[in-house]
């Protein structure tokens, strides 16, 4: 589709705009469209008719606020009311009422949905567009076989193929194929109409024998043969109306409904003029498709590229919500139909209010948001993650591909992706290439196509004209890359420019160019656009960087980057993490939890987010940045959020880094850091953990929350208040009781104490027994209690329990085992924390903060980190911040290098420090060993890059096990930290132990610590008393399991033990 925009300069669109537009499209178009499809429902006697009057539907403003929905774990939704009427046909009376259809979840200002107190987001899906596609394959004889695949709107596929004898078949499933003449006749065409509407009638007549002519005598015979080959189970079918209905349901509705997009694609591919409202496959389509297939056989026409974006469509949030709404209305129709029949049967007078229930719509959307693969929990690790998550594109999901069956060709970059799908940003692992990210300027067109903007170059007019082009159109234009940030008509363009034309990259004269790109970032996603000097990095490392920026933890003291790209402010603004002034006014009061200002004659209070937990356990917090008494304008930033400074994204820290080896502590991507990062809280972050407990009403009585827990030490209960809940502000350690709870249970007579039995015998008092089921703080959960929520729901029962949430704040400094990364894919694990006096230091006496391995740069080809490192050093000394767009070599050769060296030279001049820029080795410096004070032999690259602390922290991963649960079948320890599992000693680990000859350690690993049941029971008691651990005599359980599995295959395996002294052979039974 080709659209003309305004004639002014382009601005970066809102990053959440696609989500907002999709939801608005659903409310404005999808909702009434599905309501209009709701049929009129009659009872069995056709005396009463129920129908909806769609013209007067309305959505009511939510009764609860978004903040309360999060607090109470409710859904932020709106009630849908529609006018409905009952028409009594006998008396021609109409009873009309406004009824509640159900609740529809609403999208909030972040572009997300709030379902059961959890932020969820619906991501976009890429599907094969319905229509017809021609392709060619080689058979086993090496001969080209041409096929035409018809894809329906529901994803069903039918194929047309032509064999060696020029016979044309329709394959409606993988096994059955029928003649094209049978299919056309079954769809309503006779032989004369078929021959009159095709270009090659002689080919159709060439394989038409006498039997076929008899079958084509009537439509009934063709339908019978089609049914017999496609849907018949056995026997000879007889033509009937039920047979036609079954065929209609099994074949035509699933594989012949094209939809609006399919009809447009079919008309365009086959040069047809069938009306757009005719969305089903017609005999005319089949015949035209057959003509094109015959033309392909004769070398006429072009084959289709299935991976081209013009053959794909985007299934947005509007389509997904509309599909679920239609499904809910079908369920509602069945409910209304059954209720009407039941009311008439029991001689009751129904009303529209009694016939309709809100359950189908509400439950349909709850199951969709909870179970659908494209509905995901919003990743809120940092502000960047929130935006990027809503701009994902997935080939996976219902109707799409799977990670194990998708080919390399589908995963690869296609020329049609440029300006629409980022060639860098995708997931790593099995889903690589299947989950992508939208480019910054891409938008979704009316019929699901991805559009990208371009500037139109016109010799006649000096005005700038911007066009949005779909993938099917821009390949016919010569598209060049823009060579400047702004269109300056006074710049003399180069004579020869690189351009794109018909999926090829060419070098052409400037006069031949039709369109030009509008922005250097146009081809990239948000994550890739935040990488400075990305053009100097290998694409694989840029991919890692764009993924790792989403894993950065918000720090307690954020700092914006010295070297950036200019998109940091837009990313922070669209994330919703900032507090923005809605209109101009004056600040009256400000503190940590609110800002009060006056404007337009009113006094408004803006609440600030304080220590709110994200679903990744990071801390979301807002800090006011406007002082009291200052006047503000509309749109001005009032408060910074987590990982933002001055309204710009601030995910990491600018620290002093040296690229050099240091005693092997930075071997294989390990990182050496200074203790200054710990003591000065440079990389300190706050994390909030949530612990839940629920109270049920059991068969023995309700569970009780109390502080009086018998048989527990008073030390564990010290933080509980009189209600049995931990106090706010308490410091809790591992094992402390957070919520005291007792669960009643029925005890056996033998379990009563003697005094309890005496009371029962003499006084008849029933002594109640209860079990302690308290909420205890698990290992690694120590911290400060910052919030406690007791959500009491009405009518507490086993199905509607009360819930208590306890939130604990942890302060985590950086430590050995944490993961850090730069913005160029340079990641590493902290290996050692050195005292600052032992760190290498510069010629001005400053010790470096971090030491990276220089061998991590050449082989990985991410040279951008060197440019950022050196430019950051100059910016830190000159107190400057740089915002550099990618591909600055379009101005001149070596532009990046010249910029870095000129800034270093200027910093050296202003600070009178010649070591900052040494002409012999520019960018490097001679530094000293902090332990000895000696110079290192070689000059070293030093600088101030932007380093992030990632969410992969050692506190979440360190794990130890003494004894625990074992698998039932193999009797080996379970796997995983969550299950208190053991550490696996695999095949290669056994080889390593064998190589060192540690036989006893190897025996312990394979027997006592693993699956030898008797030996692992004996070893505990022997260790406690200090005895000698006995040698296991029989085989471990895994060997016994192998023998049993072989026996199930009728293979007997015997094993023997040979005595070390007498060499006697003893047979052992498994």
From Swiss-Prot:
It catalyses: RNA(n) + a ribonucleoside 5'-triphosphate = RNA(n+1) + diphosphate. Keywords: Chloroplast, DNA-directed RNA polymerase, Nucleotidyltransferase, Plastid, Transcription, Transferase. One of its GO terms (cellular component) is DNA-directed RNA polymerase complex. GO terms for molecular function: DNA binding; DNA-directed RNA polymerase activity; ribonucleoside binding. It is found in: Plastid, Chloroplast. It holds the Pfam family RNA_pol_Rpb2_3. Disulfide bonds: none annotated. Its EC number is 2.7.7.6. It comes from the Eukaryota. It is an enzyme of class 2 (transferase). DNA-dependent RNA polymerase catalyzes the transcription of DNA into RNA using the four ribonucleoside triphosphates as substrates. In plastids the minimal PEP RNA polymerase catalytic core is composed of four subunits: alpha, beta, beta', and beta''. When a (nuclear-encoded) sigma factor is associated with the core the holoenzyme is formed, which can initiate transcription. PANTHER family: DNA-DIRECTED RNA POLYMERASE I SUBUNIT 2. Belongs to the RNA polymerase beta chain family. This is DNA-directed RNA polymerase subunit beta. It comes from Silene latifolia. The lineage of its organism: Eukaryota, Viridiplantae, Streptophyta, Embryophyta, Tracheophyta.
């Amino acid at each position: 589709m080709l659209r003309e925009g305004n004639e002014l300069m382009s601005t970066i669109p809102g990053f959440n705009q696609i989500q907002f537009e999709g939801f608005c499209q659903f409310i404005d178009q999808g909702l009434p469209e599905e309501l209009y499809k709701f049929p009129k429902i009659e009872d069995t006697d056709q005396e009463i008719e129920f129908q909806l009057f769609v013209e007067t539907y309305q959505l009511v403003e939510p009764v609860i606020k978004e903040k309360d929905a999060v607090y109470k774990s409710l859904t932020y939704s709106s009630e849908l009311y529609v006018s409905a009427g009952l028409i009594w046909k006998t008396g021609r009376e109409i009873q009309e009422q406004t009824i509640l259809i159900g609740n529809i979840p609403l999208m909030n200002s972040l572009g997300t949905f709030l379902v059961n107190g959890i932020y969820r987001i619906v991501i976009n899906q890429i599907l094969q567009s319905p229509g017809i596609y021609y392709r060619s394959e080689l058979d086993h004889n090496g001969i080209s076989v041409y096929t035409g695949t018809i894809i329906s709107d529901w994803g069903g596929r039918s194929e047309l193929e032509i064999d060696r004898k020029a016979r044309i078949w329709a394959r409606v499933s993988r096994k059955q194929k029928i003649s094209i003449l049978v299919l056309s006749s079954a769809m309503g065409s006779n032989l004369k109409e078929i021959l009159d509407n095709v270009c090659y009638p002689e080919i159709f007549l060439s394989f038409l024998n006498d039997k076929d002519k008899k079958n084509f005598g009537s439509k009934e015979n063709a339908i019978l043969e089609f049914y017999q080959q496609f849907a018949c189970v056995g026997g000879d079918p007889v033509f009937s109306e039920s047979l036609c209905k079954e065929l209609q349901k099994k074949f035509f509705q699933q594989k012949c409904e094209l939809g609006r997009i399919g009809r447009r694609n079919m008309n365009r591919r086959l040069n047809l003029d069938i009306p757009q409202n005719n969305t089903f496959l017609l005999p005319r389509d089949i015949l035209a498709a057959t003509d094109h297939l015959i033309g392909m056989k004769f070398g006429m026409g072009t084959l289709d590229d299935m991976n081209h974006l013009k053959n794909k469509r985007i299934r947005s949030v509007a389509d997904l919500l509309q599909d679920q709404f239609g499904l809910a209305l079908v369920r509602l129709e069945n409910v209304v139909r059954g209720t009407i029949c039941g009311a008439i049967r029991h001689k009751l007078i129904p009303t529209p209010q009694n016939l309709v229930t809100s359950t189908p719509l509400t439950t349909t959307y709850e199951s969709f948001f909870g179970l659908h693969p494209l509905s995901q929990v919003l990743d809120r690790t940092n502000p960047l993650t929130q935006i990027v998550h809503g701009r994902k594109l997935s080939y996976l999901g219902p109707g799409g591909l799977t990670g194990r069956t998708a080919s390399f060709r589908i995963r690869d970059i296609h020329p049609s992706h440029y300006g629409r799908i980022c060639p860098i940003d995708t997931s790593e692992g099995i889903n690589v290439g299947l989950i992508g990210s939208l480019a910054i300027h891409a938008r979704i067109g009316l019929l699901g196509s991805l559009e990208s903007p371009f500037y139109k170059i016109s010799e006649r007019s000096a005005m700038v004209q911007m066009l949005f082009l779909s993938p099917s159109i821009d390949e016919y234009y010569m598209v060049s890359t823009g060579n400047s940030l702004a269109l300056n008509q006074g710049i003399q363009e180069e004579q020869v420019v690189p351009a794109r034309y018909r999926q090829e990259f060419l070098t052409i004269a400037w006069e031949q160019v039709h369109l030009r790109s509008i922005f250097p970032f146009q081809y990239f996603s948000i994550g890739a656009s935040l990488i400075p000097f990305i053009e100097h990095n290998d694409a694989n490392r840029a991919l890692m960087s764009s993924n790792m920026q989403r894993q950065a933890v918000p720090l307690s003291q954020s700092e914006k980057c010295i070297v950036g790209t200019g998109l940091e402010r837009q990313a922070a603004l669209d994330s919703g993490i900032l507090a923005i002034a809605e209109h101009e006014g004056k600040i009256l009061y400000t503190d940590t939890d609110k800002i009060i200002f006056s404007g337009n004659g009113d006094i408004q209070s803006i609440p600030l987010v304080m220590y709110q937990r994200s679903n990744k356990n990071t801390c979301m917090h807002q800090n006011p940045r406007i002082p009291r008494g200052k006047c503000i304008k509309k749109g001005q930033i009032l408060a910074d959020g987590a990982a933002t400074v001055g309204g710009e994204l601030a995910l990491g820290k600018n620290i002093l880094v040296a690229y050099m080896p240091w005693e092997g502590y930075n071997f294989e991507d390990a990182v050496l850091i200074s203790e200054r990062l710990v003591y000065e809280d440079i990389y300190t972050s706050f994390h909030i953990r949530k612990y839940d407990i629920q109270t049920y009403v059991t068969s023995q009585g309700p569970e009780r929350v109390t502080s009086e827990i018998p048989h527990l030490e008073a030390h564990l209960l010290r933080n509980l208040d009189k209600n049995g809940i931990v106090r706010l502000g308490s410091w809790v350690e591992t094992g402390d009781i957070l919520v005291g709870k007792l669960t009643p249970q029925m005890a056996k007579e033998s379990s009563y104490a003697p005094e309890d039995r005496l009371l029962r015998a003499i006084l008849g008092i029933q002594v109640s027994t209860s079990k302690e089921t308290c909420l205890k703080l698990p290992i690694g959960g120590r911290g400060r209690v910052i919030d406690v929520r007791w959500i009491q729901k009405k009518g507490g029962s086993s199905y509607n329990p009360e819930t208590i949430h306890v939130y604990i704040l942890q302060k985590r400094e950086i430590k050995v085992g944490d993961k850090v990364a730069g913005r160029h894919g340079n990641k590493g694990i902290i290996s050692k924390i050195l005292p600052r006096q032992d760190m290498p230091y510069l010629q001005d006496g400053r010790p470096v903060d971090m030491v990276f391995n220089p061998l991590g740069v050449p082989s990985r080809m991410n040279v951008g980190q060197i440019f950022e490192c050196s430019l950051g050093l100059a910016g830190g000394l000159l107190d400057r911040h740089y915002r550099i767009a990618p591909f600055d070599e379009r101005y001149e050769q070596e532009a990046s290098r010249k910029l870095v060296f000129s800034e270093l030279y200027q910093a050296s001049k202003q600070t009178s420090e010649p070591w900052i820029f040494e002409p012999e080795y520019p960018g490097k410096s001679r530094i000293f060993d902090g332990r000895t004070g000696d110079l290192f032999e070689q000059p070293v690259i030093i600088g101030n890059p932007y380093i992030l602390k990632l969410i992969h922290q050692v506190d979440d991963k360190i794990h130890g096990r003494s004894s625990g649960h074992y698998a039932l079948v193999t009797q080996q320890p379970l796997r995983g930290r969550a299950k208190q599992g053991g550490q696996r000693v695999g095949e290669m680990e056994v080889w390593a132990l064998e190589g060192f000859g540690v036989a006893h350690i190897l025996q312990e690993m394979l027997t006592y610590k693993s699956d030898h049941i008797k030996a692992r029971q004996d070893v505990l008691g022997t260790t406690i008393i200090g005895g000698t651990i006995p040698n296991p005599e029989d085989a471990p359980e895994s060997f016994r399991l192998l023998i049993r599995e072989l026996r199930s295959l009728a293979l007997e395996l015997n094993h023997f033990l040979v005595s070390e002294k007498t060499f006697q052979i003893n047979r052992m039974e498994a």
